[in-house]
C-alpha cells in the first residue's frame, strides 16, 4: 500500500492530528517553556541513541523489496518544516512534556531523503506544477497541470502532444480501484493534476477559458473530470460551482448558482458514467454518513460550492461536511474491496499556515504571511515587535509573525523532507528531484518498470502497503507490510 500522509487531521488520534486553518495555531510555539517534566540525564539520551542505532542496524538486515499492492498518498499543501517542527512540539506539550523531544509518527520511518521543489521555469513552484511532478513523474512549467515543459501558461496550442498521465490513471489501467479526497475544490490545482491536462490551473470551468483559447480545442478542468476522471471510483471534496451551470441552483445555498456557461451539469455526467445502482452522490454530512461502503462501488461527494471549511470552522457549517479523516476512512472502505488493490490520494488544503525577551516570541517563523502586517504596524507605532505576553498564541485567530506582509502565507523554495517506510522505501536515499517520487511509486507498485515485478515476490493475500507523505514544501513517504 502506498500512502502519502498530509499533516492534517487524517488520523485524529495519532500524532498526525492537527487542526487545519489558514493561520494554524499549531505553528505557534512560545520561546518561554516551563520546567522539564521528565529526566533527561545521560541515561535518557544514551538509551534513546542506542535504540535509534539498533533500528538502523535492523533496517539494513530487512530491506523490503516486495511489491506494493495498495497506495495511499496524503498531501498537505504548503506545509513546511517549520510547521512540522511546531506540530512535534505542540504534540509533546499537549501530552504534558516540553515538546521538542517528541517524535511524530512519520519521523519513525526508517528512510529519509530530501526533495527539490522548483518548477521548470520558476524557483518556487506552484501547486499545479508541483502536483504534476509528484503525480505524473515529470517537471512542468509553473501553473501547468498534467503537461510536460512544452506546455506554456495560457497557451492552448502548446498543450497539444504535451500531456502526461498521473499514477492514479496508470493504476486504473492496471486494474486497481482509484480515487481521491481533498478539502479543496476537486478542480483545484493539486487534485486536478491527477486527471486534467491544462495550460492553466485557473481554467476550472468553461467560462474561465479565453474565447480564443477555447476555439483551439482546450477543455476546462471540470469537463475533464468527466472526460478523464470518470474512471475514478471515489471523488470527495468541494467545488460544486465549477461543475454546475449558471442556471442551476446550489442545494446548500439556494441564492447561489454554478459558474459554468455551457449549461452542462458535470455532476450528473460523472454519475451517468457509473453503474447507477451502486453509485452515490452526496453533498452534506448526513448523506455522507449514510453511505454504506459494502453497498457502494463509486462515490462522488461535493460538500461546498468552493473549498471545504477550515477544520476549526467545520462545525459552523449547517449542512455539515465530513472531516478529512472521515473522507479518508470512507474512501478506503470502498476501494479496499478490490482484490487487485487500490490507489488513493488525499490532500489537506490550508496547511500554508502559522507556525513567540521578557517579551515572548515564536521560535519558528515564516518569511511571509498575514502576521507581517501586524509586526509592521507594531514597529511603526511603538518601534518594536509586538509583545505576546498576554496574547493567546493558541487561539484560532492568532496570526503568526512574518517578515513580509501578505494576505496569506506562500510556498517556499527550499528542499522538503521525505520519510519512507515499506516496500522499496530504501529508494529514497539522498537529494531527489520532485518528479522522482512518482517513479518510486510506479516502481514499487509495478505500474511500469516490469522487471521489478518479475524479480520480486508477489504481493501477499493482504497486500504490501506503501505509505507516502507529501506536502508541497514537506514530503514524507511510508511503505509498510
Place the predicted regions along the sequence by residue.
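Cleavable N-terminal signal peptides of Sec/SRP-targeted secreted and luminal proteins
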Residues: 3-9, 19-36, 467-480
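His/Cys-centered metal/cofactor-coordination and adjacent catalytic loops
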Residues: 146-161
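A post-motif C-terminal structural segment
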Residues: 40-54, 64-70, 79-136, 141, ...
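A conserved hydrophobic secondary-structure block that centers on an alpha-helix together
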Residues: 173, 178-181, 187-190
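Short glycine- and acidic-rich boundary segments immediately preceding or forming the N-terminal edge
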Residues: 17-57, 173
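Surface-exposed patches in mature extracellular/periplasmic domains of secreted proteins
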Residues: 163, 178-184, 450-455
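C-terminal GPI-anchoring signal of eukaryotic secretory precursors
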Residues: 453-467
Amino acid at each position: 500500500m502506498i500512502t502519502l500522509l498530509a499533516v492534517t487531521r487524517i488520523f485524529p488520534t495519532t500524532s498526525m492530528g492537527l487542526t487545519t486553518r489558514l493561520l494554524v495555531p499549531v505553528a505557534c510555539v512560545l520561546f518561554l517553556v516551563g520546567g522539564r517534566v521528565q529526566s533527561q540525564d545521560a541515561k535518557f539520551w544514551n538509551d534513546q541513541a542506542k535504540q535509534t542505532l539498533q533500528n538502523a542496524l535492523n533496517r539494513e538486515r530487512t530491506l523490503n523489496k516486495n511489491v506494493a499492492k495498495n497506495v495511499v498518498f496524503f498531501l498537505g499543501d504548503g506545509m513546511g518544516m517549520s510547521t512540522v517542527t511546531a506540530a512535534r512540539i505542540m504534540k509533546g506539550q499537549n501530552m504534558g512534556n516540553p515538546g521538542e523531544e517528541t517524535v511524530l509518527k512519520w519521523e519513525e520511518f526508517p528512510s529519509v531523503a530530501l526533495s527539490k521543489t522548483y518548477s521548470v521555469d520558476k524557483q518556487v513552484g506552484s501547486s499545479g506544477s508541483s502536483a504534476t511532478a509528484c503525480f505524473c513523474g515529470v517537471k512542468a512549467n509553473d501553473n501547468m497541470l498534467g503537461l510536460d515543459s512544452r506546455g506554456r501558461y495560457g497557451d492552448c496550442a502548446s498543450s497539444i502532444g504535451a500531456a502526461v498521465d498521473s499514477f492514479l490513471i496508470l493504476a486504473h489501467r492496471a486494474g486497481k480501484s482509484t480515487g481521491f479526497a481533498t478539502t479543496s475544490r476537486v478542480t483545484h490545482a493539486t487534485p486536478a493534476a491527477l486527471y486534467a491536462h491544462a495550460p492553466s490551473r485557473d481554467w476550472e470551468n468553461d467560462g474561465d477559458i479565453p474565447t480564443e483559447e477555447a476555439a483551439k480545442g482546450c477543455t476546462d478542468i471540470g469537463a475533464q473530470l468527466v472526460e478523464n476522471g470518470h474512471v475514478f471510483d471515489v471523488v470527495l471534496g468541494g467545488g460544486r460551482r465549477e461543475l454546475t451551470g449558471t442556471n442551476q441552483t446550489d442545494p446548500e445555498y439556494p441564492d447561489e448558482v454554478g459558474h459554468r456557461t455551457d449549461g452542462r451539469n458535470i455532476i450528473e455526467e460523472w454519475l451517468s458514467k457509473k453503474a447507477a445502482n451502486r453509485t452515490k452522490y452526496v453533498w452534506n454530512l448526513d448523506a455522507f454518513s449514510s453511505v454504506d461502503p459494502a453497498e457502494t462501488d463509486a462515490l462522488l461527494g461535493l460538500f461546498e460550492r468552493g473549498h471545504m471549511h477550515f477544520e476549526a470552522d467545520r462545525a459552523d457549517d449547517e449542512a455539515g461536511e465530513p472531516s478529512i479523516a472521515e473522507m479518508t476512512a470512507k474512501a478506503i472502505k470502498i476501494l479496499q474491496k478490490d482484490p487487485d488493490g487500490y490507489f488513493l490520494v488525499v490532500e489537506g488544503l490550508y496547511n500554508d499556515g502559522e507556525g513567540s525577551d521578557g517579551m515572548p516570541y515564536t521560535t519558528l517563523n515564516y518569511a511571509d504571511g498575514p502576521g507581517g502586517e501586524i509586526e509592521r504596524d507594531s514597529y511603526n507605532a511603538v518601534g518594536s515587535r509586538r509583545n505576546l505576553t498576554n496574547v493567546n498564541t493558541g487561539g484560532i485567530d492568532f496570526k503568526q509573525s512574518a517578515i513580509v506582509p501578505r494576505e496569506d502565507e506562500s510556498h517556499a523554495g527550499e528542499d522538503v523532507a521525505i520519510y519512507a517506510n515499506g516496500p522499496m522505501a530504501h529508494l529514497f536515499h539522498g537529494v531527489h528531484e520532485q518528479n522522482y517520487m512518482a517513479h518510486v511509486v510506479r516502481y514499487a507498485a509495478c505500474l511500469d518498470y516490469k522487471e521489478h515485478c518479475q524479480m520480486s515476490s508477489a504481493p501477499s493475500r493482504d497486500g504490501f502497503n506503501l505509505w507516502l507523505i507529501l506536502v508541497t514544501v514537506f514530503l514524507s513517504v511510508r511503505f509498510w507490510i
